Amino acid sequence: MKEFYRQTVKEVLDRVESSEAGLTSEQADHSREKCGWNELTEGKKKSISQIFFEQYKDFLVLILIASALISGILGDVESVAVIVIVITINAILGTIQTVKAEQSLQSLKKLSGPEAKVLRDGTTVQLPARELVVGDIILLEAGDMIPADGRLIENASLKVDESALTGESLAVEKDLETLSAEVPLGDRTNMVFSGSFVTYGRGKAVITDTGMQTEVGKIAGLLKSTSEKQTPLQVNLEEFGKKLSILILIFCGILFAISVFRGEKIGSAFMFAVALAVAAIPEALSSIVTIVLSFGTQKMAREHAIIRKLQAVEGLGSVSIICSDKTGTLTQNKMTVEDYYVAGKRIPVSELDLDDPAQRFLMDYSILCNDSTNENGVEIGDPTETALINLASQHGLAAASIRNLYPREGELPFDSDRKMMSTLHRIDGKNRMIVKGAVDRLLELTEQIWTHDGIREITEADKIKIQQQNQSFSMEGLRVLAFTYREVSEKHTLSMDDENHLIFLGLIAMMDPPREESKAAVAECIKAGIRPVMITGDHKITAAAIAKRIGILQDLSEACEGADIENMSDAELKDFVPKISVYARVSPEHKIRIVRAWQEKGMIVAMTGDGVNDAPALKQADIGVAMGITGTEVAKDAAAMVLTDDNFATIVKAVENGRNLYQNIKYAIRFLLSGNFGAILAVLCASIAGLPVPFAPVHLLFINLLTDSLPAIALGMEPHSSEVMNEKPRSADKSILTKDFLGKIGLEGFVIGAMTMLSFLTGYHMNGALLGSTFAFGTLCLARLFHGFNCKSDHPVIFTKRFFNNKWLQGAFVLGAVLITSVLTVPEFHRVFKVETLNLMQLGCVYLYAFASLLIIQLLKWIRMKFRQR
């Protein structure tokens, strides 16, 4: 069956079983039984308890739970308590973030206007929007939110702002004409859509779709069917957890086999293996990563980027494609006059001279033949008309004053058939009719032209020159209005017959201009290896003109329309997207397909936008970025990040922050794993050598959860560097555990383990196993605290300013050193931590071994740096 916009008014009324008189209450009830309420439905929500328990599905967390169970069976209550506390805190943090993430459909409901004027039982009544049904006749006027989708049956110069649905900033002129061809949403001029606004005129429409069947409802369905994406960090950490668990099993198996082979009891050998497992798993890793990302969100919030989904902090730093909406994102979402063409000259608005009679006439007439107002900063009316009022205001002209000086005495409102608007005024003692409209249409009716030398007959050469200028404006993406006038007789009532014998005055060209910061932000993206792509519901020429201004597009061949990709297969689209930088006249479904096509090519995609039409693609993208000021609630709630200043440049800063945070998280992971590897190495060496276990399980948990956690968090707050923006985006499939990264962890862990083992042997030979264990415990704690400074850079930093540029790391070191020194020297701690009291000389020996590990690792970095320079 044909779409409603391709059917006549009578065919539509028959199809929805209605008439121009509307429905009766009985008919409305019957229709509601078939179609339901005019509201958006939701999928089943997860309870907070479900969300909370989902946090325990993390692979590392499951390993920790298993370790806690084994420790409990073996009677190690302290280990169980510490592990349970850590994973519970992590689950609470994850739940708080997730609970905020699924509110898109609630925001979409807000677009169903609270009330509407409807014809019911033969009279006009005001009803809640949710009670409207298919077949109802709704009455529309300027300022109304349209409550449902409908086919127009009456039209009086109706204009509708559909930017939230289509992305096009200009109000759409509506008509009653039946369309024969299949056209995009933005070109269905005989239809009105739920969630859009009437900006001008009046009309009547018969409702054709309500609730989930409206265009807004279809978007709600897309939101429900679009799955959440994992960020690269989530993928990498999951991969890391699996690899780590394999290593742990291998190490534990080796240790258990060695112990049994040496004749130890299976129970004690198993306990020994559990101690190694506890040492191998960085218990605080999940919570530390979450805390570092949380600190990152606070920093980004201060820089106008609100993070709604925690892992988006890192994910944004790895994007390689930014698919950006045009209207309100790259542009100001505000029509602005760019140029005048008057007396044969093109004049940029920056060069306007109101002492010039022609320019002053054109400005005055653009105010008089204009229905918009701007009082106390509140704009009412069509965006193109408010642009004319705003320009006058910028030049010190008050529209109200000019209108009072030359009051309107008659008018012929704009309609899409005539493509013009006329007003009558008393000017200089004469009745003057001002006519504005489409250039081609007005030139047909023009007989004279205003020049500085006076009014003369317009020639064919004049018309060609005007048409060429109009074409030039259009190719630059500018919307053009022509202004003409004529004298009419006294006490004259305007009619369409008067719209001829006109005198041409000039052209005014306007556009929704780019934001001032967009060009620089796009250039910064390209420098960082990120490709910006414009996706918009606007016209191709307009979109391409904006894209060329800001550096997204170089040639018109890089632009296409939604119709061009409509019939492409997914495989064809995947090959097509690298060639295109601008997509115009696209639907929400097109946006999702474009995002998916880039994702299938292995790209990490960010999608920016502010309208309802952007919401599904925002959710499909790896990172959805919504505008906070001009953005709809739907877009904000579907996004992972919201920009509070609507500044495209904020995205670039967010990318920089994301890259730096990922780097800092790598520092923290490097710190934790190399330290843990040192502990494993010490345990294995002792086992192979037939020596006592150098650590008690409580030692290892103390190190992992106290002296490790604070430095790791501090490394996550390492000062940011702008140098990361000189690098290309990180590959989506690149693991965080590269060979080079693992090599550094292994080498640094070896040094820490070696110093720990030497310290253990020193204490062991001094006074037996307990003192040896105390030496090993103290050295490992302090060596890992010193190691925080090693992890700040791949280069040696010990004799540079960078060694001291992180006050958080310095604080963590001092606090950790005080804690471990207290444990080693205060007798009350000895029974709990299973250590022996150290005297000053013994304590100095422990510190010396720990500091030696710092010096050795710094020396190895210096050697590596010099080797690479060669």
Roles of regions detected by a PLM:
Residues 1-726, 736-737, 750, 777, ...:
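Conserved cytosolic headpiece of P-type ATPases
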